Curated annotation (Swiss-Prot):
GO biological process: fatty acid beta-oxidation; phenylacetate catabolic process
Active site: C91, H343, C373
GO molecular function: acetyl-CoA C-acyltransferase activity
Catalytic activity: an acyl-CoA + acetyl-CoA = a 3-oxoacyl-CoA + CoA
Name of the molecule in the record: 3-ketoacyl-CoA thiolase
Pfam family, one: Thiolase_C
Function of the molecule: Catalyzes the final step of fatty acid oxidation in which acetyl-CoA is released and the CoA ester of a fatty acid two carbons shorter is formed.
Gene encoding the protein: fadA
Entry superkingdom: Bacteria
Locations listed in the record: Cytoplasm
Length: 387
């Protein structure tokens, strides 16, 4: 079977969804600029070799509708001979794009793919036009479509306290701020045009969403937002609403080597798994277990881990049940996570994978895991191996 590898991976800065730096920039533009950037950064690659553009996006309507993958690839000047498809596995969409490209490569159905994802949550709100089937309540808990309440349920089931959640959120902001100040995001961020608070055109080079001033004291003053009477989950311990895109160049290994392109990581294994929709945030546990089994590995073999921080109340039970409580500081979300950076839904899978690969290089690590929960009860996981 052929081997799929990551040749390059980048992302936009993360912009705030409310009056943020990308308020006048469309989702197609964020996407197209990254597609162009991959070609600029890898001049050995003839664009005519691209088999397909596979792009994750959850809210496929308004500017993100009508196959945003194709719209963005045409904007980017990708040859018209390349295909383009938009995929939707909710929060796991752009990680699913990685998996789709890898499966195609492994089965000989192409050797060069641009993948990624986008979500402009400022322009297309996450609940825009959502209309659940009334009969769904006969199969799953009525609150299963309300992500914050599923986090509340998972946190209660695992005894996660408000203080534990607040501490996890503070860590996320502190780590992300330190990564910014120390230049550790520089290799993964592709600067984009945006607008400052006064409307002036600027080059955006850093994430806008991080709040370095976050403390236990400031978070303690926030009220529970999803279950005001009995809850513990606040806006401060939930992933921020943000606008952003991420992208990767995924190739068949021998093809990349023949072109003299760098190989930053191999895709060692992949998995998706389902769980109860009422505790959708638990999905990373079965997905990770499945991916590790397919790779012949255990959690002890993992050097670096990116676990998408949808909610602190969701992340901490996953850490616990994967047996990772003792290695959080050494291995998990070392540059912060979605609580600090935001979770632009269709973007996040390739975003956390990009951050992971850069961390693996920085730490000289061999095996890394990127995993995330998915609304309505799924998880997705990818094991990467540095060459």
């Amino acid at each position: 079977m052929k081997q799929a590898v990551i040749v390059d991976c980048i992302r936009t800065p993360m912009g705030r969804s409310k009056a943020g730096v990308f308020r006048n920039v469309r989702a197609e533009t964020l996407s197209a600029e990254l597609m162009k950037a991959l070609l600029i950064r890898n001049p050995q690659l003839d664009p005519s070799l691209i088999e397909d553009v596979i792009w994750g996006c959850v809210q496929q309507t308004l500017e993100q509708g009508f196959n945003i993958a194709r719209n963005a690839s045409l904007l980017a000047g990708i040859p018209k001979t390349a295909g383009a498809v938009t995929v939707n596995r909710l929060c796991g969409s752009s990680m699913d794009a990685i998996h789709q490209a890898a499966r195609a490569i492994m089965t000989g159905m192409g050797d060069t793919f641009i993948i990624g994802g986008v979500e402009h949550m400022g322009h297309v709100p996450m609940n825009h036009g959502v209309d659940f089937h009334p009969g769904l309540a006969n199969r799953v808990a009525k609150a299963s479509g309300m992500m914050g309440l599923t986090a509340e349920m998972l946190g209660k089931m695992h005894g996660i306290s408000r203080e534990q959640q607040d501490a996890f959120a503070v860590r996320s902001h502190q780590r992300a701020h330190a990564a910014t100040v120390e230049g550790r995001f520089a290799k993964e961020i592709w600067a984009m045009e945006g607008h400052d608070a006064n409307g002036a055109l600027i080059k955006v080079m850093h994430d806008e969403v991080i709040r370095p001033e976050t403390t236990m004291e400031s978070l303690a003053g926030l009220r529970p937002v999803f279950d005001p009477a009995n809850g513990t989950v606040t806006a401060g311990t939930s992933s921020a609403l943000s606008d952003g895109a991420s992208a990767m160049l995924v190739m068949e290994e021998s093809k990349a080597r023949a072109l003299g392109l760098p190989i930053r990581a191999r895709i060692r294994s992949m998995a998706v798994a389902g769980c109860d929709a009422a505790i959708m945030g638990y999905g990373p546990v079965p997905a990770t277990q499945k991916a590790l089994a397919r790779a012949g590995l255990t959690v002890a073999d993992l050097d670096v881990i990116e676990l998408n921080e949808a909610f602190a109340a969701q992340s901490l039970p996953c850490v616990k049940d994967l047996g990772l409580q003792d290695v959080v500081e050494e291995k998990i979300n070392l540059n912060g996570g979605a609580i600090a950076l935001g979770h632009p839904l269709g973007c996040s899978g390739a975003r956390i994978s990009t951050t992971l690969i850069n961390l693996m290089e920085e730490k000289d690590a061999t095996i890394g895991l990127a995993t995330m929960c998915i609304g309505l009860g799924q998880g997705i996981a990818t094991v990467f191996e540095r060459v």
